[in-house]
Swiss-Prot record:
Protein name according to UniProt: 6,7-dimethyl-8-ribityllumazine synthase
Pfam families: DMRL_synthase
Protein residues bound to 5-amino-6-(D-ribitylamino)uracil: F22, A57, V58, E59, A81, V82, I83, F114
Keywords: Riboflavin biosynthesis, Transferase
GO MF, one example: 6,7-dimethyl-8-ribityllumazine synthase activity
Gene that produces this protein: ribH
Protein function: Catalyzes the formation of 6,7-dimethyl-8-ribityllumazine by condensation of 5-amino-6-(D-ribitylamino)uracil with 3,4-dihydroxy-2-butanone 4-phosphate. This is the penultimate step in the biosynthesis of riboflavin.
Organism the protein comes from: Shewanella baltica (strain OS155 / ATCC BAA-1091)
Residue runs in coiled coils: none
HAMAP family, alphabetized: Lumazine_synth
Family per similarity comment: Belongs to the DMRL synthase family.
Sequence positions that bind (2S)-2-hydroxy-3-oxobutyl phosphate: G86, T87, R128
Reactions catalysed according to its record: (2S)-2-hydroxy-3-oxobutyl phosphate + 5-amino-6-(D-ribitylamino)uracil = 6,7-dimethyl-8-(1-D-ribityl)lumazine + phosphate + 2 H2O + H(+)
InterPro entries membership: LS, LS/RS, LS/RS_sf
Amino acid sequence: MNVVQGNIEAKNAKVAIVISRFNSFLVESLLEGALDTLKRFGQVSDDNITVVRVPGAVELPLAARRVAASGKFDGIIALGAVIRGGTPHFDFVAGECNKGLAQVALEFDLPVAFGVLTTDTIEQAIERSGTKAGNKGGEAALSLLEMVNVLQELEQQLL
């Protein structure tokens, strides 16, 4: 039986982090978690990390698509925070962001890690950006590192 799985070290990986400025007090913590994970666990150097800032979560897929189209990166981490309010706006923003990022991954055969918080309350978002429930930015970085390795392993085995 052949089992393909990745590890989390990716010293030579070139990673783009596309980050929303909206809810910046939360999203900056996600960025810190992602950067710490990439450097500490993945051994990714600062020179191989590019941070792209966009206004909000709706803009993440377009920026991710442009990054993917450049062909210069091994993976993308998308970071943002969408918190439910009193209108259906949350559903549209969260859904379109998720769908758009998934489309980029499939179109460009490139891992796109989803580190966008989609919570009902600000308290839930705070918990997920580095307090009680961990740091979802760091978790997205771990996922990306593993997927970069899985895809490289698949490419080697399938050629």
